[in-house]
Amino acid sequence: MKKFCVEEQTENIINWIKDWYKDKSGYAIVCISGGKDSTIAAALCAKALGADRVIGVLMPNGEQKDIKDSKKVVDFLRIPHMTVNIGEAYNALTKSIELAHNFDNISDKSREVYKTNTPARIRMVAAFGIAALYGGYVVNTCNLSESVVGWETFGGDGFGCFSPLGKLTVQEVIAIGDYLNLPKELVHKVPSDGMCDSTDEEKLGFTYECLDNYIRTGVRPKSAEIYQRIMNLNKSSHFKHEIIHLPTYDPGLYICEDFNW
């Protein structure tokens, strides 16, 4: 079984991005959230194409406390960037839907799903708009760990033109970030949707370390409850990947057959 080598994989990804762009002109458009995935994806694109061919797009939803992390990313990488506040677009869309259908009849759970996923979809619309205006391709920044349990927004961050990280686990992505000497506070930032105080792992009910080990070794979690939770999330979200087939860097590493990936 092939083992993950951070130096080899990092160089391979950079070369893969170069190869993907060899017959294309224009920019790599990266939605910069301030988390590890967008930070590392932007850094890899800058290494492959040059910093001047990467446009970082910061998209706060109104007042957003962690937008400062997004600014750290573009400043550190020295890439061209712009800020597009999606707050007015989100509020206008929500108001229009409320006028068309009374929200009083909608469950709290459905409201939460809307509140979490709609900003991500608006951001992707904006990213493709910028790609059309400036000439470029939107970078998908999702990782394998998130994708196998559907922890991405269909029509939002799950979209893009190509995916440099889509077959790498969270632990592997972090290792690449450290290898590139990116700021540790960004590479090791605790993942969350930015909408509430809960982390992704708290919402998932298991750690990414546990999930990553299962993905790469095939050894199921000792907890039957966690195993079932992972499988339920995988099965309920697999339709996303039956529909979308992005060009994705393949590290040639084992993925457990349980995930039907």
Q: Which residues are covered by each model-predicted region?
A:
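ATP/NTP-dependent adenylation/nucleotidyl-transfer catalytic domains that generate, transfer
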Residues: K2-V30, L44-K47, D52-I55, N61-G62, ...
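Acidic-residue sensor for enzyme active/binding pockets
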Residues: D66, E146
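Conserved G/P- and acidic residue-centered "switch" motifs that form tight phosphate/ATP-binding loops
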Residues: G35
